[in-house]
Amino acid sequence: MADTSDFRNGMTFIWKDDLWEIVDFLHVKPGKGGAFVRTTLKNVKDGHEVEETFRAGAKVDEVRVERREHQYLYEDDYGLHFMDQESYEQFSMPPEQVEGREFLKEGGDVDIVFRADTEEPLRTEVPQKVDLEVTETTPGVKGDTAQGGDKPATLESGATIDVPLFINEGDVVRLNTETEEYETRVSAASTV
């Protein structure tokens, strides 16, 4: 059992028969009345966030979670399949538990968060920066870059992002998965 004085960002606990992670919290001690803690909680299973207030000293059941690196294998009707990098065990997760799946490519690394006591996979965490090949975009025309600007591009994972006009099909680009924005061109397509 933990109480509100133990709250910290990333802490996971059981509340209202569900698993929640603390995204943000603030201890408040008003001049009149009892102290309380304002929190932003994220549901571990489906990802939706709620704001909740706890009285100071309220007790919650803390749950220990572990992050382990896995390799993304493929997606089919049963879900997304992953392999543990150390034991080579494979398992699948439903798509709604896989955050950032539009940036996963087969063979790519991803961290999976497990509930330590039951070994149940809870969610995935994709790397903050990933390199993906541009599979479809309009060709850049000489002189287009004078004014700057962006154009849509489809990546090998199926995601669509805005890229600068000089990016062509076959280029490998680095993007930030948190902001879902282009960062830089890693390599240009070969024109052989």
UniProtKB/Swiss-Prot annotation:
One of its GO terms (molecular function) is translation elongation factor activity. Keywords: Cytoplasm, Elongation factor, Protein biosynthesis. Residues 133-157 are annotated as: Disordered. Its main location: cytoplasm. Signal peptide: none annotated. It is found in: Cytoplasm. One of its GO terms (cellular component) is cytoplasm. SMART domains: EFP (SM01185), Elong-fact-P_C (SM00841). The keyword Cell cycle does not apply. It comes from the Bacteria. Pfam families: EFP, EFP_N, Elong-fact-P_C. Involved in peptide bond synthesis. Stimulates efficient translation and peptide-bond synthesis on native or reconstituted 70S ribosomes in vitro. Probably functions indirectly by altering the affinity of the ribosome for aminoacyl-tRNA, thus increasing their reactivity as acceptors for peptidyl transferase. This is Elongation factor P. It comes from Salinibacter ruber (strain DSM 13855 / M31). The gene is efp.
